[in-house]
Amino acid sequence: MANTTSPRFTTTQWLIIIIASIGFLFDTYELLMTPLVAAPAIAELLNVPLNNSLVTDWVGRLLWIAALCGGVFGLCGGWLVDRFGRKRVMAASIFMYSLSPFCAAYATTLPTFIFFRSATFIGVCVEFVAAITWLAEVFPDKKQRERWLGITQAFASLGGVAVTVVSIWISSHGKDLPHMGLPLSLGATDPGSWRYLLMTGILPAIPIALLLPFVPESQVWKDRRAAGSLKRPSFAAIFAPELRRVTVVTAILSACAYGIAFGALQVTVARVTPGLPELKDQAKTLVPLRKEADALNK
């Protein structure tokens, strides 16, 4: 009777699983940070109220500029991982999307803020390509490969939960945090909470820097590079007569799905009702009047 058990993992495979899981988790963490910081950051950098039309206009511009940059460089991800290696590109992309939000936290102009947020999107999109490629090559067993590609990508869903929890905590405790040289808005005594949230984007760089020295480059990539077989297939091949219909339909459906998901994730309560903070302050001033009215009605 044939042995159908899957081969046991090596230390290298476990390390790559951990690195990929961290990468996917913080992919979503970094992306979903945008709807939380975009409006307050733009309002502060332009020195206008949150409900000013300029804020809405620039939030929209930020989203499409960052998404366009990420998409273009994501398309180049395949070439990059073939040219420079899976490990090197994945490390560079994770460090890029870790350091860029930290730099954005110190932005004092809108162009600088948009530049670093676009750099974050580029890092996320390239990291996704590198991680998928690296994982696929690490597991020669088909069942293990499919299982762990799914499991590691599932960590992306935790990124949204993590950034929400961190954002809530910073909103409650931001005034107690050290300033760390962060810029202040006009008339403010404490940095905006959005700056602290952006600073947390550097977190994935710490475990990656500690783990990567112990992980070798993909052996599959090294063997193919030595054999000179890394030449990528022609882009036109996927539009061959027998594949054209599948390619076009799949591309359209994928574009719609990603477009809807990306757009929906940017709609937060702060964007739907940008005047809530002002209404809260107005409600506080009405408390004494309500008490007087209640006393008169007794």
Pin down the residues of each PLM region.
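Transmembrane-helix signature of 12-pass secondary carriers
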Residues: M1-K298
